[in-house]
């Protein structure tokens, strides 16, 4: 009892501190100002749905830079990077990233599917081309989405996902973005061991963070 007592106390204090940290983070996410709005990204993508995806993406990037100057990565920092996660394989091009938001282009040139992941973030996908099938946890039927549709993945939700070859979309995420990286990088670390892709992914996210830091300090006149 004498040995277990201090150990139990430390565990209890640790859990209490962690709970307070989570509560504080939740409050911060709820009250902070966000650069983007889900409806804005969805409407912009919907406007170009049905076009050739490369043409649509180029138009979307131009419009985002006009609406959010200083918050979209420059052309020289845009790179399509493979993503292996949850058993599926796709490719993403990061446009914007911070601790609480991201905007990226995502898709696949082959049929692929797997587990969506469960995040501390809300994710909005608006389809430009192809089809997206989603099977939600606790249900016995799947739904298919088409160009122009927006799929909302709520925080804490898990689904089965499947994309047909040639499916491309615009994705907006809002929440504690670093919490999504564990899932996004797990297959790379423990399955494919494609450490070059790991480097590309972390480099893109770092560039996004640095761009946001620069934008923040510019508002302070630094």
From Swiss-Prot:
Membrane topology: Single-pass membrane protein
Organism superkingdom: Eukaryota
Keyword Plastid applies: no
UniProt record, GO biological process: lipid transport; regulation of neuron apoptotic process
Ranges for region C-terminal hydrophobic region: 176-222
Keywords: Cytoplasmic vesicle, Endoplasmic reticulum, Lipid transport, Membrane, Nucleus, Receptor, Transmembrane, Transmembrane helix, Transport
Regions of this protein lying in the Cytoplasmic compartment: 30-222
Sites annotated Important for ligand binding: 125, 171
Chief location: nucleus
A single cellular component GO annotation: endoplasmic reticulum
Pfam families, per the entry: ERG2_Sigma1R
InterPro entries linked: ERG2_sigma1_rcpt-like
Family statement drawn from the similarity comment of this UniProt entry: Belongs to the ERG2 family.
Domain notes: The C-terminal helices form a flat, hydrophobic surface that is probably tightly associated with the cytosolic surface of the endoplasmic reticulum membrane.
Name the UniProt record assigns to this protein: Sigma non-opioid intracellular receptor 1
Organism name: Gallus gallus
Encoding gene per record: SIGMAR1
């Amino acid at each position: 009892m004498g040995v277990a007592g201090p150990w139990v106390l430390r565990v209890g204090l640790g859990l209490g501190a962690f709970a307070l940290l989570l509560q504080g983070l939740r409050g911060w996410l709820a009250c902070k100002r966000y650069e983007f709005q889900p409806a804005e990204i969805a409407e912009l993508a919907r406007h170009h749905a049905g076009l050739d995806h490369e043409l649509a993406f180029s138009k979307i990037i131009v419009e985002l830079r006009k609406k959010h100057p200083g918050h979209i990565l420059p052309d020289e920092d845009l790179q399509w990077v493979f993503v292996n996660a949850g058993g599926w394989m796709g490719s993403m091009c990061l446009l914007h990233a911070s601790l609480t938001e991201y905007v990226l282009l995502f898709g696949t040139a082959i049929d692929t599917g797997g587990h969506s992941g469960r995040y501390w973030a809300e994710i909005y996908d608006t389809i430009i081309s192809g089809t997206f099938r989603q099977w939600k946890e606790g249900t016995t039927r799947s739904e298919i989405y088409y160009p122009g549709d927006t799929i909302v993945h709520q925080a804490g939700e898990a689904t089965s996902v499947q994309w047909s070859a040639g499916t491309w979309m615009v994705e907006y995420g809002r929440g504690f973005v670093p919490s999504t990286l564990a899932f996004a990088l797990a297959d790379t670390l423990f399955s494919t061991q494609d450490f070059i892709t790991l480097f590309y992914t972390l480099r893109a996210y770092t560039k996004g963070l640095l761009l946001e830091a620069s934008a923040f300090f510019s508002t302070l006149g630094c």
